[in-house]
């Protein structure tokens, strides 16, 4: 299947030509925006969240055509196959059953294994949180260091930061991912080996960055007085390769299992989320799962016309494949969601940044947009200038939490006002005539600089309060959005072959950086010159 061969495609192209120059300002004008208002028609709810799509460049006809696109592309069939545990990752011959990790239904796949592993996690988390699990000198654990990269880092770090307000104050959680030694060194400055628990997270337990950091941390423990025989009090491992964990030196009883039917970027619901469970406790971890389950149920059962992940995915395709948007921005007006944009970068671009279709042919249309973002209001003082007055179209997801999770309640109206005002300003803009009035007769030359084109599309997601449950629903919303877009683009969102070539060449380059001699013909002239400079700096 090619995207532009679907029966609905010519109708969508014609519709795009018809409305591409229409301005959102006119659609919201009182003469056109009669009951039910545009906001009422384009606001939908599901999984405890609300989404206002009304400030997007679409009409009722647009949505009808996009929903038809979803049906013709087989979105429903792909969704149902994923939930059923079918092989939806054909290049690796695997299912993608992250939804089974939160299913809580006896007929869902792998429920016995999932329940047993979660119970083991809960026992361990309770022991650490209560002080029953101690370090080698008998002191309780005060620091947890999660060592992992990609999905073994981004998801847990994002959730622990987001739910800080419900986390235990007795344990600080640190995350180390980068192979740059500075990342680990800065954490080592803040922790005490007698009070530190290390969680090493790697699906294969061979990941270069993770194992380099794990070995350095193990050496640090021993160098700072921990007997090698007591390391079991300070190291646990999470992996789909338990034998390799034991080979590293972690006690078999301290191994938590993940499975190859869960992709790394979808794995925070598994034992990969052990650092989350220690921080917020097993009961709140269950609430996180329940929120994701709420969105799973909404995704499975809501009509496509009112289905939040479906609509979010289709709106993204509308801008990517018709308006030619190269990127889209995620702007959470919540400091608690500081790491959500970086988490979504991996979720969206590692999943859908593909050029090969499932059938092996190459696409002739754009796939994943560049995903980026920063919390509000910080972003307003960095890149919103470009969003308002630059020539580039950047669709935006605003995320607003309506009630604060902190005691400084007087700040919150200011935060929400900025979020809502930005969406309004991006939609309305300011005409040249309006700008001339502001510039006045004394400075008419200023008017062009005071104009705003407006017509910049935004979606606003509303969360009543940031709780484990609503956070779980928000994360699952984006997970399912990715699947919807992958189905329409006919690509596999569950593999990541694009990360492999650099890894392979990285091992060759690393060997050349320390080798006695290097054959300059082994690499291109640029890479050879870079290696030569680095060897000189390293004293080789």
UniProtKB/Swiss-Prot annotation:
Domain of life where this protein originates: Bacteria
PROSITE patterns referenced in this protein's UniProt entry, alphabetically: P_GLUCOSE_ISOMERASE_1 (PS00765), P_GLUCOSE_ISOMERASE_2 (PS00174), P_GLUCOSE_ISOMERASE_3 (PS51463)
An example molecular function term from Gene Ontology annotations: glucose-6-phosphate isomerase activity
Protein name in the entry: Glucose-6-phosphate isomerase
Compartment(s) of residence: Cytoplasm
Pathway: Carbohydrate biosynthesis; gluconeogenesis; Carbohydrate degradation; glycolysis; D-glyceraldehyde 3-phosphate and glycerone phosphate from D-glucose: step 2/4
UniProt xrefs under InterPro entries: G6P_Isomerase, G6P_Isomerase_C, Phosphoglucose_isomerase_CS, SIS_dom_sf, SIS_PGI_1, SIS_PGI_2
Leading EC class: isomerase
EC nos: 5.3.1.9
Entry-linked SUPFAM superfamilies: SIS domain
Similarity annotation: Belongs to the GPI family.
Gene3D superfamilies: 1.10.1390.10, Glucose-6-phosphate isomerase like protein, domain 1
HAMAP family found in the cross-reference section: G6P_isomerase
Chief location bin: cytoplasm
PANTHER family: GLUCOSE-6-PHOSPHATE ISOMERASE (PTHR11469:SF1)
Gene that encodes the chain: pgi
Record's keyword terms, sorted: Cytoplasm, Gluconeogenesis, Glycolysis, Isomerase
Catalytic activity: alpha-D-glucose 6-phosphate = beta-D-fructose 6-phosphate
Record-level GO BP terms: gluconeogenesis; glucose 6-phosphate metabolic process; glycolytic process
């Amino acid at each position: 299947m090619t995207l532009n061969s679907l029966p609905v495609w010519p109708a969508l192209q014609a519709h795009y030509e018809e409305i591409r120059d229409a301005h959102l300002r006119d659609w919201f004008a009182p003469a056109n925006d009669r009951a039910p208002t545009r906001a009422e028609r384009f606001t939908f709810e599901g999984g405890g969240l609300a989404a206002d799509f009304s400030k997007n460049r679409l009409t009722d006809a647009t949505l009808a055509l996009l929903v038809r696109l979803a049906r013709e592309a087989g979105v429903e069939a792909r969704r149902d196959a994923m939930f059923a545990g079918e092989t939806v990752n054909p290049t690796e011959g695997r299912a993608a059953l992250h939804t089974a990790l939160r299913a809580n239904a006896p007929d869902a796949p792998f429920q016995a294994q999932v329940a047993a592993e979660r119970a083991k996690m809960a026992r361990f988390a309770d022991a650490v949180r209560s002080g029953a699990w101690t370090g080698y000198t008998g002191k309780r654990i005060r620091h947890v260091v999660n060592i992992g990269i990609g999905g073994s880092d981004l998801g847990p770090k994002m959730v622990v930061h987001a739910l800080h307000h419900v986390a235990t104050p007795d344990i600080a959680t640190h995350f180390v991912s980068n192979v740059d030694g500075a990342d680990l060194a800065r954490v080592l400055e803040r922790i005490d080996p007698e009070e530190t628990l290390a969680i090493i997270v790697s699906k294969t337990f061979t990941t270069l960055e993770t194992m380099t950091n794990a070995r350095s941390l193990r050496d640090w423990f021993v160098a700072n007085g921990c007997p090698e025989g007591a390391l079991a009090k300070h190291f646990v491992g999470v992996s789909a390769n338990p034998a390799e964990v034991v080979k590293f030196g972690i006690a078999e009883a301290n191994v938590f299992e993940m499975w190859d039917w869960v992709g790394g970027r979808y794995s925070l619901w598994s034992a990969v989320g052990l650092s989350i469970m220690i921080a917020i406790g097993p009961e709140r971890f269950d609430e996180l799962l329940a929120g994701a389950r709420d969105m799973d149920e909404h995704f499975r059962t809501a009509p496509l016309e009112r289905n939040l992940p479906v609509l979010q995915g289709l709106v993204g395709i509308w801008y990517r494949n018709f308006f030619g948007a190269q990127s889209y921005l995620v702007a959470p007006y919540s400091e608690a969601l500081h790491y959500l944009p970086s988490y979504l970068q991996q979720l969206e671009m590692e999943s859908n940044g593909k050029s090969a279709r499932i059938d092996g042919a190459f696409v002739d249309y754009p796939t994943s947009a560049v995903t980026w973002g920063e919390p509000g209001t910080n972003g307003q003082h960095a890149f919103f200038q470009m969003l308002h007055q630059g020539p580039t179209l950047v669709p935006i997801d605003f995320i607003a939490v309506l009630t604060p999770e902190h005691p400084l309640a007087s700040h919150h109206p200011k935060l929400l006002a900025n979020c809502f005002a930005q969406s309004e300003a991006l939609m309305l803009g300011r005409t040249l005539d309006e700008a001339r009035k502001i510039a006045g007769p004394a400075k008419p030359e200023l008017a062009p600089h005071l104009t705003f084109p407006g017509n910049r599309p935004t979606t606003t997601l509303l969360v009543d309060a940031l709780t484990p449950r609503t956070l779980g629903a928000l994360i699952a919303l984006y997970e399912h959005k990715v699947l919807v877009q992958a189905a329409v683009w006919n690509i596999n969102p569950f593999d990541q072959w694009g990360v492999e070539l650099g890894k392979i060449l990285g091992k060759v380059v690393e060997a050349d950086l320390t080798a006695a001699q290097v054959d300059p013909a082994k690499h291109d002239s640029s890479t050879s010159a870079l290696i030569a400079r680095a060897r000189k700096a390293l004293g080789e």
